[in-house]
Amino acid sequence: MKWEEWKPFYERIVKEMGYSIEEDRRAAELLRDILMENDNYIIKEELNSIIMQKVYVFGAGPNLEEALKKGDFKDGTKIAADGATSALLEYGITPDVVVTDLDGRIRDLLEASRKAVMVVHAHGDNMDKLPLVVEFPLVLGTCQTEPLDIVYNFGGFTDGDRAAFLAEEMGAKEIVLVGFDFSGIVGKWSKPWLRDHTPAWESKMKKLKFARELLEWLKNNGRAKIIEFSI
């Protein structure tokens, strides 16, 4: 998804969610500055080299654990969306890529970063967490405003749908969604403070609505075939 295609979605999201475009821009610039100073960033062509034709994107929905118990996932690149990283590690699976706005369990993100490329997303609400990226060996920066030179915007809003847009941008031919659920139940892996699956709160419902709409857009407009993992 190009910026011109993403912009109308973004403007709707900002209006409905009450976000600040200026704060989002500040966050993108801050992430860029940190990555440039620390020199631990990669460019998209480097990430492209590790993405296989088949990509599994792991969301943190309530059906994730059952999928991890029965799936193999060795025939494709494994991209974990933030909180799903903790579930994968618990089941002995190391993701190849983690897409995160640093909202998951930090210790698990740090563990995963030893082997995974960390795709870190900057927005107005996580500027205080962005200095953490200096702890990650390899980082690809993303944002939700206009892209900068080393901070990209491939489209997508939540960690899960952004991961799918990332896979599309990297040339995947097939994207398998694992642990995605739009029924209104939030999986316990979604937030570090959750102890069990729980009904979605108002802002989360809005995010799920946008995520579903964006994935439908990707199915209809992207090159990759997008399917849901079946147990």
From Swiss-Prot:
One of its GO terms (biological process) is thiamine diphosphate biosynthetic process. InterPro entries: HMPDK_MptE, MptE-like, TPK_catalytic_sf. It catalyses: 6-hydroxymethyl-7,8-dihydropterin + ATP = (7,8-dihydropterin-6-yl)methyl diphosphate + AMP + H(+). Its cofactor is Mg(2+). Catalyzes the transfer of diphosphate from ATP to 6-hydroxymethyl-7,8-dihydropterin (6-HMD), leading to 6-hydroxymethyl-7,8-dihydropterin diphosphate (6-HMDP). To a lesser extent, can also use CTP, UTP, and GTP as the nucleotide triphosphate substrate. HAMAP family: HMPDK_arch. This is 6-hydroxymethyl-7,8-dihydropterin pyrophosphokinase. Keywords: ATP-binding, Kinase, Magnesium, Nucleotide-binding, Transferase. Gene3D superfamilies: Thiamin pyrophosphokinase, catalytic domain (3.40.50.10240). GO terms for molecular function: 2-amino-4-hydroxy-6-hydroxymethyldihydropteridine diphosphokinase activity; ATP binding; kinase activity; magnesium ion binding; thiamine diphosphokinase activity. PANTHER family: 6-HYDROXYMETHYL-7,8-DIHYDROPTERIN PYROPHOSPHOKINASE. Pfam families: MptE-like (PF01973). Its EC number is 2.7.6.3.
